[in-house]
């Protein structure tokens, strides 16, 4: 009891202890001196200091504990660091190497107390698994929560990743050589927490003292149900949380890889079976869409610090699933199997959820533009090597009339006949009325030409060449006037005869066939 006396002496007591009880429930007794040596009652003084020690220990127990740890395991690129940084509220960060250390600030508003939760992130390469000895040892084993992170943008790796990292934890725990009695106690605690899970209600107490009392009463009154055949068959003695990240990629899997709802139900059923074997919880998250990030933090502090949470299980939304440890069982997982249409329950995960074929990305060769002068010199050399006939189309030197059609000389007709290709059998037939129309046009042309020639040959009329008395034929001026007058009568008779013939046969010209100017000029 001498030690108690030394602690009770304010001269030698720590300043924190004196300041703690300056306004405590025993302040009046200390101020009145009823517990001091001047009272002369040693027994009452010893009882007083015993009460002080008990209250100090009670207050120390009511504060938030320190030394709690979260260990994150998963493949490279699964989003482990991104998840913790988002919980911390940090946008920009740098990924560590090997074993990364972070922390979470934990604040209890009811107790007005805060502490830090240690976060260890192991590299995705198995080469670094030896670093687990710095984050998970025999002393910190009881205060550690294991978080297995799965990348849902690559669901074909989900099951293998979970089994691989769970085996890494099991191997490391076995190397710690924990006494069997202590390990058995940790396993039994995990089983008890799984069996005593209760759906969160609205009347859940908020005060820490009331929480502890209510939890103890629930444990005393509740009936513990036996575990299922596949439940906690791989008990690590540690609370486990499975976090599926990048769940926003579910829509991409539907569009690009033809995933359907039954595929996602199939994936979820296998992950939930794994969680049953290890007694783990399951949360689907998305850092990109900030989905269920706060839920991960709330579940961590609930498991490590006993904070309450009022969030029930969510299984309806395929990209925001939340299944706390102790809620799930084989019957609830069987509900997912009812939606299977083309899949079967006994199908292997690797046979259904396969890795899509890798599309080879062909890198196009970067082309550097040449100098303009070098390019023009190469082009000039290429043009110089080509023969002149191949440089372009031969120019048509035949003369053209104002209408646009070339006039072919008569002398070249015979030479060009051999070069004309034969007319195909399916070409358009020649209109038989075209010849008759061309003949009548020729007659009309001859008729009007004769009129012009006769008119120019009349006395006093201008000649063709512009000289008076000049006709189409030079001999017309030498004829006597009597001969000219006698020649006019046959011309008039020819005009009347021609007009009568045209009037009697108007249908000889085809109305649909346009006159050929080439033939008229030739006649």
UniProtKB/Swiss-Prot annotation:
Residues 412-421, 474-483 have a biased composition (Low complexity). GO terms for biological process: cell division; cellular response to nerve growth factor stimulus; early endosome to recycling endosome transport; microtubule cytoskeleton organization; microtubule-based movement; positive regulation of mitotic cell cycle spindle assembly checkpoint; regulation of centrosome cycle; regulation of vesicle-mediated transport. The modification Phosphoserine is found at residues 207, 398, 405, 412, 419, 421, 427, 486, 510, 516. The modification Phosphothreonine is found at residues 213, 408, 512-513. The keyword Plastid does not apply. Gene3D superfamilies: P-loop containing nucleotide triphosphate hydrolases. Keywords: ATP-binding, Cell cycle, Cell division, Centromere, Chromosome, Cytoplasm, Cytoskeleton, Dynein, Endosome, Kinetochore, Membrane, Microtubule, Motor protein, Nucleotide-binding, Phosphoprotein, Transport. Phosphorylated during mitosis but not in interphase. Coiled coil: none annotated. It is found in: Cytoplasm; Chromosome, Centromere, Kinetochore; Cytoplasm, Cytoskeleton, Spindle pole; Recycling endosome membrane. Residues 1-45, 387-434, 457-523 are annotated as: Disordered. Signal peptide: none annotated. ATP binds at residues 74-81. GO terms for cellular component: centrosome; cytoplasmic dynein complex; endocytic vesicle membrane; kinetochore; late endosome; microtubule; recycling endosome membrane; spindle pole. GO terms for molecular function: ATP binding; dynein heavy chain binding; GDP binding; identical protein binding; molecular adaptor activity; protein-macromolecule adaptor activity. Its main location: cytoplasm. Residues 458-473 have a biased composition (Gly residues). Homodimer. The cytoplasmic dynein 1 complex consists of two catalytic heavy chains (HCs) and a number of non-catalytic subunits presented by intermediate chains (ICs), light intermediate chains (LICs) and light chains (LCs); the composition seems to vary in respect to the IC, LIC and LC composition. The heavy chain homodimer serves as a scaffold for the probable homodimeric assembly of the respective non-catalytic subunits. The ICs and LICs bind directly to the HC dimer and the LCs assemble on the IC dimer. Self-associates. Acts as one of several non-catalytic accessory components of the cytoplasmic dynein 1 complex that are thought to be involved in linking dynein to cargos and to adapter proteins that regulate dynein function. Cytoplasmic dynein 1 acts as a motor for the intracellular retrograde motility of vesicles and organelles along microtubules. May play a role in binding dynein to membranous organelles or chromosomes. Probably involved in the microtubule-dependent transport of pericentrin. Is required for progress through the spindle assembly checkpoint. Belongs to the dynein light intermediate chain family. This is Cytoplasmic dynein 1 light intermediate chain 1. The gene is Dync1li1.
